[in-house]
Amino acid sequence: MRPMTFIVGLKTLWILAFSSLSNTLAVNNSGRWWGVVNVVTSTNLLTDTKNVQLVLDPSLQLLSRKQRKLIRQNPGILHSINSGLQSAMKECKWQFRSRRWNCPTTGGDNIFGKIVNKGCRETAFIFAITSAGVTHSVARSCSEGSIESCTCDYRRRGPGGTDWHWGGCSDNIDFGRVFGREFVDSSERGRDLRYLMNRHNNEAGRMTVFSEMKQECKCHGMSGSCAVRTCWMRLPTFRAVGDFLKDRFDGASRVIYGNKGSNRASRVQTHHLEPENPTHKPPSPQDLVYFEKSPNFCTYNGKTGTSGTSGRVCNSSSLGLDGCELLCCGRGYRTKTQRVTERCHCTFHWCCHVSCLNCTNTQVLHECL
């Protein structure tokens, strides 16, 4: 009996260990494609020959087979992906510049750190903004002629209104959304709560870019009378996308894993997200969702990869999140002065140069203890 008990116990431990490893790999694989931001050169004049390996840079080894195939099928698109990811990183840092979590990044493969291993609000924003970055950049690159497989969106043609008509070069948001969905979502594996959360937030980012598209027009007529206008659809600024997603971050929905039961007859997907609080309405496609409480980000935590707020500059006169009381988590702050030299009293001289003086000012800084 004892040998049999030992074997059963050993088998149980092996299954648990394998399950834990699988979950860890699933978490880490979700954002592996972010590593393309470290690509030294974003040119991707890649052959379509099966015998030639699609790895011109070590960072591309982080991509799945499907993602590498998509890059090979769309020459020029790797530069667009890289640019979109760069924009997403900058926007994330700007939106959270005054928060305890200020969207820190690293130079390694996992550029956003260990926080993405948690199902919290911050992870939701990271997935949404990076997905939006790819869609936005690819759609813009199509209209600029930077990608061989797409062009402007010319579907809108002919009369549009009483004094205007469709024309010009609309940004190709449809190609950006389709490519973004195939490229970004292909890194998600499984059918668990984290999978549903990441897929939902990825789509929320793409939907935000689409919903914020604006109509632009150019006037035609004698002396600028604007008797007739030619109009096209233009992408929003990425700052507008970031502002929208930041609002969704503040109002994010906490969700649980919902399962209506199997339905073999209709083959309908029964797994879905439900609000943790049954009195709340289900999240909309543009809402951000999370399932785990965020760390407080006040002190260093190696498990979550948070560095704390010690040494951060705070605003002593603010009662908001950037104020010293909240940002420093009640630990207090130190005040110091520093001398800063800046260019000032600049004058333009015809033609063509600008002359400036150097002005030295004293700045007062408050840093969290």
From Swiss-Prot:
Sorted UniProt keywords: Developmental protein, Disulfide bond, Extracellular matrix, Glycoprotein, Lipoprotein, Secreted, Signal, Wnt signaling pathway
Domain of life: Eukaryota
Subcellular location: Secreted, Extracellular space, Extracellular matrix; Secreted
A GO BP annotation: canonical Wnt signaling pathway
Pfam family for this entry, one: wnt
Sites carrying sugar chains: 28, 315, 358
Lipidation (O-palmitoleoyl serine): 223
Region: Disordered, residue numbers: 263-285
Disulfide bonds: 92-103, 142-150, 152-169, 217-231, 219-226, 298-329, 314-324, 328-368, 344-359, 346-356, 351-352
Keyword Membrane: no
Posttranslational mods: Palmitoleoylation is required for efficient binding to frizzled receptors. Palmitoleoylation is necessary for proper trafficking to cell surface. Depalmitoleoylated by NOTUM, leading to inhibit Wnt signaling pathway.
GO cellular component assignments: extracellular space
Residues of the signal peptide: 1-19
Main location group: secreted
GO terms of molecular function: cytokine activity; frizzled binding
Membrane in keyword set: no
Record's function text: Ligand for members of the frizzled family of seven transmembrane receptors. Acts in the canonical Wnt signaling pathway by promoting beta-catenin-dependent transcriptional activation. Plays an essential role in the development of the embryonic brain and central nervous system (CNS). Has a role in osteoblast function, bone development and bone homeostasis.
Protein family membership: Belongs to the Wnt family.
Name recorded for this polypeptide: Protein Wnt-1
Protein source organism: Ambystoma mexicanum (Axolotl)
Gene that encodes it: WNT-1
